[in-house]
Amino acid sequence: MLSLSKNWNALIKTDKVSYESFPETNNKSKIIVEPLERGFGLTLGNAMRRVLLSSLQGAAVTSIKIPGIEHEFSSIPGVKEDISEIILNVKGIEIKMHVAEKRVIRLKATGPGAITAGMIEAGHDVEILNPDHVICNLAKNKQFEMELTCKVGKGYTLSTNNNEDNNLPIGEIAIDALFNPVKSVTYKVENTRIGQVTDYDKLIMFVETNGDILPEMAVGLAARILQEQLQLFISFEEQEEDKQVKTDALPFSPYLLKRVDELELSVRSANCLKNDNIIYIGDLVKRTEADMLRTPNFGRKSLNEIKEILAKFSLRFGMDVPDWPPENIHELSKRYEDSYN
């Protein structure tokens, strides 16, 4: 009977996820995942994007109260914007809450000039993430007051859902709320190669948050949500042999499964190997010395450096390695990691 675990163990396992931050902000990151099986870049990228934009917990203003105002179709003398415009601007306030319970924060200001989110008296439990965001503009000597109710939630909710059973007091206006801390997610899929195989997927994602959480945390939370939801579909029990880590004897030295980027090589030598798509020591020892010297920018000094390192593992150039590369090389590399470290 075919082992069930071969359905997932035979797939390529990505080695790592890399995060690249942008120097101008900590709220935006480039995430690179490679290598992936062909088609998995699109599958994972689309699923992660949907979860990131819809399912993470965040905080937002859900209602406002302005003295003397009973509904959103009003205007205030001395205020440039009408209530509808003020509500639209309030929806753009980005906040972070340090408690799970709702909080009421207050804004008191006197004109003239622009009134910004940074003027709100937020207290210790609420943090304003975009203090320069303009709420309204006041005429000279005009006083303006407003109470804002903040809550924790997920996704996007309409004002009708934020009016708790139509129990809001008169004068308190429910507004639409965007709780999600993720502002934007884009992704693209490119080809990447391992050895001579060039059609593996590389997933590149760009994630930007409002500062409530870091992009790395947002990606981790989205993955955890997907993991929890997909667990429901696993309707079988793994066979006993699937649960055990197999350690059958290899037809070659486990040192061949060590990645060359883990060797203490000079930058020049490491770059030459990388540019020639030599990933594992097994890829390296199958080359002859003559093959290596034909590699661009690879000279005798680099050759001698690598020969000394290979000798420490009782290896050399020009070796005949049976069954190399194995189909499940990434799985084997992780399984035998303790053998060569």
From Swiss-Prot:
Q: Where is this region: Alpha C-terminal domain (alpha-CTD)?
A: 247-341
What are the GO MF terms of this UniProt record? DNA binding; DNA-directed RNA polymerase activity; protein dimerization activity
One protein family per Pfam: RNA_pol_L
A biological-process GO annotation? DNA-templated transcription
Family assignment from sequence similarity = Belongs to the RNA polymerase alpha chain family.
NCBIfam families linked to this entry: PRK05182.1-2, PRK05182.2-5, rpoA
> What's the name of the protein?
DNA-directed RNA polymerase subunit alpha
At the highest ranks, the source species' classification is: Bacteria, Pseudomonadati, Pseudomonadota, Alphaproteobacteria, Rickettsiales
